[in-house]
């Protein structure tokens, strides 16, 4: 039995931890031993799930550019191979590619692991898990970690049965998807005449330029930070990061590009920039993909996370004729709800978070930033042939209001229990004040549409941290200030909830 506390590594539906020293006060807890034990436990979980013995299983391992990726991949492979399972080294890969390794005829793995911590700093790392059903659920990770806790590390000097260039297969798949969308072939250079710049943030997305855009004829001059570098020396590879977005905005405008694309480290998220330098993020990225899909899925339902704005609902429902289901935070929650709707016969082609996680029904419900980019580029090429700009797709999306997020720290020991109590009282106070509470699946949402204010607020409980985020959007600064004033009144008097950020 391991002395490590592996349960502390769980982060929702994956594993996250500190993999190397280098940041003061942060000590390593995602060790080689932990990866070894988790690898073994994953095999035991797969045996039950697949109905196969360990020596019949084939498992792929990929990694992102992080400096601890290779050693953790090796440690996990040692654990997996010790059970008799065959381990394939996919090297530098992307999270979506590792799921597709289960789908592709050339691989058909029974399961796969991706060593990544997404956009987190260089000292962090983690593990994402896949089987034929997609990414594992919270309960699956919990089971795997509990099993791993009772195992002992196993060594194997040659754990990999073979090396496989998965990224090239995955890139070919994406390239052919563009050709199919445009009814063209690679030799016809269907992206000729388009200028597209890419910011890979020194993560894993550099292949998108060399293996997809250039072979299809696009001009990619001005693309930046394409070389994988696990220290991420230029900016955080995160489409939600202000510095990262400023970098791709600048590159797009300076190089007179038709479109700018930015990806996170492991390429399961993306965002875009129009030729004007306008960023397409949060509400607008969801609006854009909804507009692309609307002609093929009229009247369908778009599933989003809880912090999307009323302007998005207006655009989806009034301008596109779609339905908007505003669900919960957490990309797995949003994707699972989309899958559930389709299984019930309610057509839902897209599940997307404001973070840039987006999954299409027609792409295995996989949150794949590169696949979304492929859809966007295909639409850009079609629009260009008709002398249209891609931004015309969301020209009727109302302008963004004045947004703010306040994070209230919970001082109670049992923060979830206390947070739920706060939400109950908050809702009760809102009802007493005769405020408008629309249908909602997470926290308490209030809409304001009167002479006092135009906008909305959402108070919710963080999924993992002792924090209650309060999101507010007002149509104008005056509206936002009025909503903040109302929020102050509604959250007053909770002794173990620190709301002082509202006073700043």
Description of each model-found segment:
Residues 1-76, 82-83, 159-196:
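An N-terminal, well-structured beta->alpha segment
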Residues 14, 61, 98, 113, ...:
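Buried hydrophobic positions in well-ordered alpha/beta secondary-structure cores of metabolic enzymes
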Residues 44, 48, 52, 58-124, ...:
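N-terminal small/polar loop signature for handling phosphorylated ligands or for N-terminal nucleophile
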Residues 61-65, 198-200, 274, 362, ...:
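Short glycine-centered, acidic/aromatic-flanked micro-motifs in structured strand/loop junctions
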Residues 90-91, 95, 146-176, 274-354, ...:
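Proline/glycine-rich low-complexity loops and linkers
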Residues 122-147, 273-289, 363-374:
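A short, gly/pro- and small-residue-rich
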Residues 123-252:
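Gly/Ser/Thr-enriched, mixed-charge loops and adjacent short helices
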Residues 298-471, 476-504:
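Phosphate-binding and adjacent anionic-ligand microenvironments
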């Amino acid at each position: 039995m391991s002395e490590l506390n592996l349960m502390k590594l769980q982060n929702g539906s994956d594993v996250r931890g500190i993999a190397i020293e280098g940041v003061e006060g942060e000590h390593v807890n995602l060790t080689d031993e932990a990866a070894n034990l988790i690898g073994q436990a994953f095999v035991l979980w797969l045996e039950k799930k697949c109905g196969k013995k360990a020596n019949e299983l084939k498992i792929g391992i990929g990694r992102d550019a992080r400096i601890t990726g290779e050693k953790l991949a090796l440690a996990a492979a040692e654990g997996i191979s010790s059970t008799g399972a065959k381990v394939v080294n996919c090297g530098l890969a992307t999270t979506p590619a590792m799921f597709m390794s289960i789908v592709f005829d050339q691989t058909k793995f029974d399961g796969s692991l991706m060593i990544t911590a997404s956009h987190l700093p260089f000292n962090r790392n983690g593990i994402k898990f896949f089987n034929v059903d997609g990414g594992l659920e919270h309960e699956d990770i919990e089971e795997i970690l509990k099993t791993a806790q009772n195992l002992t590390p196993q060594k194997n000097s040659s754990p990999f049965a073979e090396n496989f260039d998965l990224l090239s297969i995955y890139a070919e798949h994406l390239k052919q998807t563009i050709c199919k969308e445009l009814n063209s072939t690679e030799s016809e250079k269907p992206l000729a005449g388009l200028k597209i710049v890419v910011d890979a943030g020194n993560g894993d997305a550099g292949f998108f330029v060399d293996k997809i855009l250039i072979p299809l004829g696009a001009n990619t001059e001005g693309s930046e930070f394409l070389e994988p570098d696990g220290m991420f020396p230029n900016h955080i590879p995160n489409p939600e990061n202000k510095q990262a977005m400023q970098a791709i905005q600048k590159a797009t405008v300076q190089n007179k590009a038709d479109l700018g694309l930015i990806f996170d480290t492991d390429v399961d998220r993306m965002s875009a920039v129009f030729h004007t330098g306008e960023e397409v993020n949060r509400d607008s990225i969801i609006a854009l993909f909804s507009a692309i899909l609307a002609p093929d899925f009229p009247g369908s339902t778009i599933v989003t996370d809880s912090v999307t704005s009323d302007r998005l609902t207006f655009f989806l429902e009034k301008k596109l004729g779609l339905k908007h289901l505003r669900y919960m935070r957490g990309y797995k929650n949003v994707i699972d709800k989309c899958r559930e709707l389709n299984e019930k016969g309610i057509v839902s082609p897209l599940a997307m978070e404001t973070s840039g996680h987006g999954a299409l029904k027609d792409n295995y419900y996989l949150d794949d930033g590169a696949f979304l980019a492929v859809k966007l580029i295909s639409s850009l090429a079609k629009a260009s042939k008709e002398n249209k700009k891609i931004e015309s797709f969301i020209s009727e999306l109302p302008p963004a209001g004045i947004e703010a997020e306040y994070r209230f720290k919970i001082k109670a020991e049992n923060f979830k229990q206390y947070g739920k109590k706060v939400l109950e009282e908050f809702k009760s106070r809102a009802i007493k004040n005769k405020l408008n509470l629309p249908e909602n699946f997470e926290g308490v949402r209030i809409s304001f549409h009167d002479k006092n204010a135009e906008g909305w607020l959402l108070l919710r409980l963080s999924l993992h941290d002792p924090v209650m985020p309060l999101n507010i959007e007002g149509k104008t600064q005056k509206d936002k200030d009025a909503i903040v004033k109302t929020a102050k009144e509604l959250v007053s008097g909770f002794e173990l909830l620190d709301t002082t950020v509202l006073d700043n």
